[in-house]
């Protein structure tokens, strides 16, 4: 899928606030790619994953239809299921990142956490504590 195609797909499912968050995450993730020189994926793959990172968790999009296998597996890894503890979810992303196939999900999660911390006007104490508690599991 092209970057334009991913934008169009995300615009169909995200509200304006979520789309703005997704764009910030995508841009940050693309920048972080420069730190990982052995990444077997292009910056565009990581950028698109950043855009799509909340599709399964926060929308009604049908899973397993839109993306190729590698993208789908990374997106599934980024999707926190409701019955999973947040710290366990973060720890799984970190553990899976040992395999270069899943490094894009790790990069996107780093960018996602950074964006949440950067939104000081909307970062509640509850969210701040949640993300701070999860950081040791991610880094």
Where are these regions (language model features)?
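Active-site helical microenvironments for divalent-metal-assisted chemistry
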Residues: 1-139
